[in-house]
Amino acid sequence: MKRLICTVLAVAMMITGMAAFAESEGPRGGMGGPNGERGGGPNGERGGGRMGGGGQTDKSSDAELQAMITEVAPKFQLLTYEDSETGTTLQYQLYIPENYDENQSYPLVQFIPDASAVGRDADYVLTQGWGGLIWATEEEQAKHPAFVVVPVFTETVVDDNFNHSEQIEVAVRLIQSLTEQYSIDTNRLYTTGQSMGGMTSFYLNVSYPDLFAASLFVGSQWDNSILNVLEDDSFFYIVSAGDPKASVGQAGLMEVFDSDGAAYSHAEWSAQDDAETQNAAVEALLAEGNSANFVTFELGTTLAEGQTSGGGAGEHMTSFDYAYKIEGVRDWLFEQVKA
């Protein structure tokens, strides 16, 4: 049973020199993006602000991603949810399984991108990387027919000081609306996201502890003083050792688990390992039998050949896609069913 926790948000910052919330400037003048993310060129993100450094993640050479952008992105529908509670609207990208049968029950994956997608066109939440598209590929759908939803937020919905916006609650009601509209199994709802998206997924697990069957947190962190609720959850938490903030957050959460005597598994892998090696590593990790799984990419392994740094944010932005490329983790996610 999940624990009832007290939502206390004011904690000591994990990295000194962090700018205060009131001083931060987001992509649309709202909350500053986690780790200083700003919008950048096509298929890339540009660092800026607190953790940024002007570095850009150029994904034009990722042939698999470019193929997904061409072949998979057009299969999503751009729709608008009208929220009766707030009177506001929220756009979202929705993938409906091919040959959808209302007599069958389908899982749903929610992907939330990083803050560089805020203020961009609605297609960017898909084309920015692997996180939204991979679930809707023919290969994935052949194994795991599923709905995929990607909210198009118009403001930065969480920040480094653990503030959050009302749009998160609207996104929750969107999921609830989809489960009423389609034949979606409410025991197989999954959330994942990178940076701001991972932070949002942390927040959702704390605020709605019975909503998701499992989570995949990528390159992100949250207030560890309230994350002991995750000790009863099923998740993978993947960061790069070269991510100066998310790696600290991950280590801090493992300390919480240690302090409470909660079981978990942890492994360090090279992001450059081939698929067979990575999937074998996933199997070895899961063989330990724990529902909480932490993975740290070894320092420098998310950088492109010849790249010595990811900018001021280190290997933050460069680590996201590597996490979503791990087939064994994706397969594990769909095996999770809410008790």
List the predicted regions and their residue ranges.
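Primarily recognizes the serine-hydrolase "nucleophile elbow" in alpha/beta-hydrolase
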Residues: 180-181, 187-231
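Gly/Ser-rich "nucleophile elbow"/oxyanion-hole loop immediately N-terminal to the catalytic nucleophile
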Residues: 99-100, 104, 158-195
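C-terminal catalytic histidine-bearing segment of alpha/beta-hydrolase fold enzymes
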Residues: 52-53, 238, 242-245, 263-339
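Cell-envelope and extracellular/periplasmic
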Residues: 112-119, 179-182, 194, 201-206, ...
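Catalytic His-Asp charge-relay segment
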Residues: 232-241, 254
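Active-site machinery of serine-nucleophile hydrolases
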Residues: 108, 112-172
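Sec-dependent N-terminal signal peptides of Gram-positive bacterial secreted proteins and lipoproteins
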Residues: 3-22
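A domain-start/cap signature at the N-terminus of enzymes
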Residues: 23-108, 199, 265-272, 339
